[in-house]
Design a protein with these regions (language model features):
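Transmembrane beta-strands of outer-membrane beta-barrel pores
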Residues: 135-140, 154, 165-169, 193-199, ...
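Short acidic/polar hinge/loop motifs at secondary-structure boundaries
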Residues: 78-104
Length: 529
């Protein structure tokens, strides 16, 4: 009898926990980013990261190799290197704790201009030690592409590795190593190393980077200190660069649990040498950033600012030219959460864009000649002001997100972006779709995407991604194809093996207007141990 009673209590606790998880929102809007929690969704177990990313309203798919648009892919805030397609198409949603879609993190992450970050926080597979996976790409004009992805975990250590190789009129090799050490409940160390080697007939280049991130939690309230140190070296036939960097950041409640503060300092020292002329220049960036969030039961108010101090020095012929300047990234945002299903956001963001250092130090024209005219010997900024209105409705099987942003760009064309996405899950079928609309005086363009997935008997999974571009869409003008398509077939074999095939850029094979024939088959294999 006592044993049956304990079983009943355990079942009730599990039921309450499940109901609590189902009541939590799948999507959470924050001041500078949107959080997606795959574990709160109803998953079959075989959904990929790419399937979840279809929920992102501003996702712009330009092709199988241009899925993330302007997003920089990171894992635990460490930039990924090389071929990221395997990560997108093969990483399981059940292995992801949360996805941070950072579209306005100029204060928190120091992104410049329209730069965005897609940060993946992984979790170890349940009852498994890890997984290993690989892929190979076979096409008419794209040949010799392969990647390997692996995750291994123990009680105190997780190790993630990604390596990719590409042979197409040259060789490209990429390696990423990512290790997390949990010393105890309050101390954690994350180390990161990446290397790339590119050997093309025109030039050979290489880059290595190492970074360490140490986290210490002081108390039960969540006061946390982050310390970061890193170094990067890059070299090509024209330039060589050395870049040491540091970050110190404190996140803590302030005075009460309702008010939280993020305070940080960040700096790097870029040393560049032009090999042919032996000219050199140094750029020292030093940032101070502060952000406050005040939370009420249904309201969240966030204000923040990052001040960036630039000091740059050009050395040539014994003469030293020095310049200094200051930049500001600012945000102010209010989020209204009437219940656990609906969220509404109104935000203002001030960003800036700098001309390339090459324009100033090498007297060289970039893709935009106006950059040199704008610089006139100084790195003068262009201000970008964004006003954003967003709404999200989310639960386990249905999520709808809409975003509207107006951008006022200094000395450039102002424009408006309207984005919407929807996700719906029913028995044996998942439907995801969205649209992106760009409006400016010079013209209007749009894209429409639809991504259904069917779950068949014997664990077969068939998915399709279709994106249509209007005539003035930059993607259509670049590739000539009005439609992008990718057909995916996946089949698990037992509990450990999964085999998949992606036929990507498939309409390039049939469209006479295609400027590049990119269609190919990508074969993927995963083993979980």
């Amino acid at each position: 009898m006592p044993r049956q009673f304990l079983i009943l209590i355990s079942f009730l606790l599990l039921s309450v926990s499940t109901l609590a998880d189902s009541s939590l929102p799948v999507v959470e809007i924050k001041a500078d980013r949107t959080m997606i929690y795959p574990q709160r969704m109803e998953l079959t177990g075989e959904e990929s990261l790419m399937d979840i990313l279809q929920m992102v309203p501003e996702l712009l798919i330009g092709g199988y190799e241009d899925v993330l648009s302007s997003y920089n892919l990171r894992i635990d805030n460490c930039p990924m290197n090389g071929d990221t397609r395997l990560i997108l198409s093969q990483m399981k949603a059940k292995d992801i704790a949360k996805i941070q879609v950072c579209d306005n993190t100029g204060v928190a992450k120091g992104t410049i201009g329209m730069g965005r970050v897609l940060d993946i926080n992984m979790k170890m597979p349940e009852r498994l030690t890890g997984f290993a996976e690989g892929q190979g790409d076979f096409g008419k004009e794209v040949v010799g592409i392969g990647s390997v992805n692996a995750l291994y975990g123990s009680q105190h250590t997780d190790l993630y590795a990604n390596a990719s190789y590409r042979h197409q009129n040259g060789n490209e090799e990429y390696l990423t190593l990512h290790m997390t050490n949990r010393f105890d409940d309050r101390n954690r160390l994350l180390t990161y190393f990446t290397q790339q080697y590119i050997d093309h007939p025109a030039a050979v280049s290489r880059k290595v980077m190492g970074r360490a991130r140490y986290f210490h939690t002081f108390n039960e309230l969540g006061t946390e200190l982050l310390l970061v140190g890193g170094y990067q070296y890059a070299s090509d036939p024209v330039l060589s660069n050395k870049l040491p960097l540091f970050i110190a950041e404190l996140n803590t409640p302030l005075f009460s649990e309702r008010l939280s503060m993020m305070l940080g300092v960040e700096g790097d020292f870029l040393m560049t040498r032009e090999k042919d002329t032996d000219r050199s220049w140094n750029v020292f960036n030093n940032d101070i950033y502060l952000q406050f969030t005040y939370s009420l039961p249904k309201w969240k108010l966030t204000v923040g600012n990052r001040v960036m101090f630039y000091n740059y020095n050009l050395k040539e012929g014994g003469i030293s030219q020095k310049h200094s300047d200051t930049r500001n990234n600012t945000n102010a945002c209010i989020v209204y959460v009437p219940d656990n299903r609906n969220q509404l956001q109104l935000g203002y963001y001030r960003k800036y864009y700098n001309p390339s250092y090459l324009v100033l130090f090498m007297d060289a024209s970039t893709l935009y000649d106006e950059e040199w005219m704008k610089a006139e010997g100084l790195l003068e900024e262009w201000d970008i002001h964004q006003v954003k209105l967003a709404y999200a409705y989310s639960k386990q099987k249905l999520t709808v997100q809409t975003e509207a942003s107006y951008y006022a760009v200094e000395d450039e064309e102002n424009f408006t972006e309207l984005d919407v996405s929807a996700y719906w899950k029913t028995k044996g079928l998942t439907l995801t779709g969205g649209s992106n609309l760009y409006i400016a005086r010079s013209g209007t363009s749009a894209s429409l995407r639809f991504a259904p997935t069917v779950y068949l008997p014997c664990d077969w999974q068939i998915g399709m991604q279709v994106v249509y571009y209007t005539k003035k869409s930059p993607t259509r003008e670049l590739y000539g194809t009005p439609v992008y398509g990718c057909l995916s077939v996946n089949k698990p074999f037992g509990k450990r093996w999964t085999l998949g095939v992606d036929w990507h850029d498939m309409f390039d094979a049939f469209c006479s207007d295609a400027l590049v024939n990119r269609h190919a088959a990508n074969v993927k294999l995963q083993y979980r141990f």
